[in-house]
Amino acid sequence: LEELEKNDVIYAARKFNEAELLYPQSVWAPRAALMAAYAYFSQLYYDDTIVELEKFLQKYKNHPRRDYAYYLLALSHYNLIIDETKDLEEILKAKQYFKIIIKNYPNTEFAIDSEFKLELIQEILASKEMYLARYYVDREKWIPAINRFKTVINDYETTIYVEEALHRLVELHYKLGLVDESKKYASLLGYNYQS
């Protein structure tokens, strides 16, 4: 702990790992494994944190602090989200682990923050769909654009992107001569957003 307090994270994590290896049957072994993960997390070494936590979760299946391990794991993936327009891997992993927390540990302090983070992830995923839809519109690929806008409406209905997606669906259907479809989306737009 002394090394951790001095911000010598790598050395502290190694010492925690060493303690786990030297005393595998003690109550300190899983605690040391969690502390190694926390040491990395505290200094933003998220990849190392993920490795430590995955080992912990695999090894200590009945540990009472698995909720904390899942939470740190989810946060580590969440903090690795750099550009949602390119790579969804970290977003989807974060979403997966936040859902595990909400499902398996609903009465913990971590569940509330996990729900909030899931809402933010939904916004990120919806923005990805909108980015792709606009990409198709710019290239006059109407059908793929329509499909992406529909995905926003169907899968991300609580996000801020629904209004724009409906607006674009009205435009695209009208442009394609599908007036009835255009009117359907226009009525949804008017009813829900008074647009």
What does each model-identified segment do?
Residues 1-195:
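Acidic, polar-rich low-complexity tracts and alpha-helical solenoid repeat scaffolds
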